[in-house]
Structures are given as structure tokens and as C-alpha cells.
Amino acid sequence: MTYDYVPLKEKYEKEVVPSMMKEFGYKNKLQVPRLEKIVINMGIGEGSRNADLIEIHARELMAIAGQKPVVTKAKKSIANFKIRKGMPLGLKVTLRGARMYNFLYKLINIVLPKLRDFRGVNPDSFDGKGNYALGLPEQLIFPEIAPDQVKRIQGMDVIIVTTAKTDEEARKLLALLGMPFKR
């Protein structure tokens, strides 16, 4: 599936790149940090005991991301958690290219404003290498999910991976793309 018009990628090329070159003194466009991928992870603890749960959430994650998720499995057995090696524990999707830009656009402009008492995302959630992690409390805030079809509310993690070397560069990149950080 190809996308002819990707508004966030256009904004990146026309506004973000010149602004970042000016602010950080890059000599070449290719030095400017860019988005590499977005990983959406859904940890389903009860997935090891209930296979239907994995299937239901896989359909929801596929609707949200527009791409089939991969089932994540336990790497080793842990007796205290009643987990054996190879049991399904969650789902993940890796978005790149146009799908990644469209998901980020939807996240910034539609999903985050729907959160209750939303005053901006935490500016301290960077990992030290220019990647940003964000937790979402439920799947209902996405427009693709019908509230009456949801059997169980499930949160998810969204990790935005950039080519930025520092958190400062990554924060500026995401802010210029429209990410609403807390003041």
C-alpha cells in the first residue's frame, strides 16, 4: 500500500530540516536527525493462559497500525510467573516509512488530545540516545477501535526511534513535528 500524500513527511522536509540545520549548525541535510521507526508494543500478561486474548488484541493492533503484529514469546521459563519458554506474552508492530509518519500524525493530532486530563507528554522520557518512549493507557482512544467491540481494555507502549545522537536533538525534532511536550 503506497501513500501519495504524507503530511508529516512533507512538514519534515520543508520546515524541520531547515530549522534544525540552522539551530544545530549542520552542514548537510543528511546530518539532520530523522525518524527511523516506531515500535508499538502491547504486553498481554494473561496471553499465556488465554490464546483468544492474543488474537483479539492482534486484530485491534492491526487496525491501529495498519500492519499485522508479531507475537512476542517468553525467552525463558519463570516458575514464579507461571511462564514457560515459548509462551505468547504480547504483540509488537514495527512501522517504517509512510506508515510511520501517518501513525505519528494520527498520534499527535487525534489520539493524544483524546486522553483524559492531557497537558502534554513527559519531556523526560528520552533514553539518552535520542529515542522516545510513551505509554498509552487504553486502545479505546484510537479512532479505529469501536468501544462496543472491546472486551478488555489494554494499554500499549509506543517507542519512537530517531537517528539523533542526543536527547536535545531528538526533543527538538519531535517538537518541530508537533509532539506536545509539557512546559
Swiss-Prot record:
A GO biological process held by the record: translation
GO (cellular component) term, any one: ribosome
InterPro entries: Ribosomal_uL5, Ribosomal_uL5_bac-type, Ribosomal_uL5_C, Ribosomal_uL5_CS, Ribosomal_uL5_dom_sf, Ribosomal_uL5_N
Keywords of this entry: Ribonucleoprotein, Ribosomal protein, RNA-binding, rRNA-binding, tRNA-binding
Record carries keyword Cytoplasm: no
Molecular-function GO term, any one: tRNA binding
A Pfam family assignment: Ribosomal_L5
Family: Belongs to the universal ribosomal protein uL5 family.
HAMAP family: Ribosomal_uL5_B
Subunit structure: Part of the 50S ribosomal subunit; part of the 5S rRNA/L5/L18/L25 subcomplex. Contacts the 5S rRNA and the P site tRNA. Forms a bridge to the 30S subunit in the 70S ribosome.
PANTHER family tied to this protein: 60S RIBOSOMAL PROTEIN L11-RELATED
Function: This is one of the proteins that bind and probably mediate the attachment of the 5S RNA into the large ribosomal subunit, where it forms part of the central protuberance. In the 70S ribosome it contacts protein S13 of the 30S subunit (bridge B1b), connecting the 2 subunits; this bridge is implicated in subunit movement. Contacts the P site tRNA; the 5S rRNA and some of its associated proteins might help stabilize positioning of ribosome-bound tRNAs.
Protein name: Large ribosomal subunit protein uL5
Protein species of origin: Kosmotoga olearia (strain ATCC BAA-1733 / DSM 21960 / TBF 19.5.1)
Gene name for this UniProt entry: rplE
